[in-house]
């Protein structure tokens, strides 16, 4: 049986104020994510097609609130919401302390994370958005 929990996730990634506990399951990354501060990810998306995340995400918000910006609208996801975030979005706002789980195709996530990591490393030390 393929399954994972926050406690059993074998990978821990911390990128500043973002903490991910994750596991790969049959081509998908299951990520239990905590957002410790409000973050606008716009600068991290530079270099992706349309400068937006092209990964689809399915998930559930346990606590807090987060916002995805599309070319034509913003969508807000709050505690208790199950969600689908299609390609072409930017995470632009969240309530500090927001926690959610999301499911992302692993190969698409790796492509996006390579660009985001490059952008984070190019930023002045200690800067956040």
Spans of model-derived segments:
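A short, polar/proline- and glycine-enriched secondary-structure boundary/capping micro-motif
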Residues: 42-44, 78-80, 103, 111-114
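Short histidine-centered beta-strand/loop micro-motifs
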Residues: 42-52, 70, 93
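Short acidic-glycine-tyrosine-enriched beta hairpin
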Residues: 70-88
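Ligand-binding loop in jelly-roll beta-barrel domains
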Residues: 87-112
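A short, N-terminal "cap"/entry segment at the start of jelly-roll beta-barrel domains
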Residues: 1-42, 49, 116, 124-129
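General beta-strand recognition
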Residues: 67, 76, 99-101
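Charged, glycine-enriched surface loops/patches
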Residues: 73, 115-119
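Short, conserved beta-strand element in jelly-roll/cupin
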Residues: 51-68
């Amino acid at each position: 049986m393929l399954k994972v929990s926050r406690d059993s996730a074998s990978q821990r990634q911390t990128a500043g104020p973002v903490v991910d506990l994750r596991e790969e399951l049959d081509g998908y990354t299951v990520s239990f994510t905590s957002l410790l501060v409000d973050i606008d990810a716009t600068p991290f998306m530079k270099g992706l097609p349309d400068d937006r995340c092209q990964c689809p995400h399915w998930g559930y918000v346990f606590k807090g609130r987060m916002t995805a910006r599309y070319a034509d609208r913003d969508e807000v996801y709050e505690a208790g919401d199950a969600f689908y975030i299609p390609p072409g979005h930017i995470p632009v706002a969240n309530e500090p302390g927001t926690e959610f789980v999301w499911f992302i195709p692993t190969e698409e996530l790796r492509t996006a994370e390579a660009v985001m990591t490059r952008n984070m490393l190019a930023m002045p030390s200690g800067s956040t958005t």
